[in-house]
Amino acid sequence: MTLVYQSTRDAQNTVTASQAILQGLATDGGLFTPVSYPQVDLDFDTLKDASYQEVAKLVLSAFLDDFTPEELDYCITNAYDSKFDTPAIAPLVKLDGQYNLELFHGSTIAFKDMALSILPYFMTTAAKKHGLENKIVILTAT
């Protein structure tokens, strides 16, 4: 069963995950959110030794269920690679008795690298799924 995403402004405005990725915003100006949230069963004993990429596959496969496992693997493997200055991608570091998730190891040293590293792979994969051949441009600013 394919997970359906609806606009925050009109629950009748629904799309698949790949359509939401391509559209960005709903035609009514709303954001797309899942109609229902999938249950993601995560075994913490397994997760503690898993790579960032492995955890990403587990979580994203539940929310992007119209992507094949091969498509997700392609997106994740290419997005979270040596562009980051640590193999952990987003290490959890203990400092003064508190744990901090470091989201600054990407090319721009900003948390946005976490999302913007995978976005072009999601968009080009979604475009192929829908037979679109237009050039995709992603413009960002800090």
Predicted segment positions?
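PLP-dependent amino-acid enzyme catalytic core
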Residues: 1-142
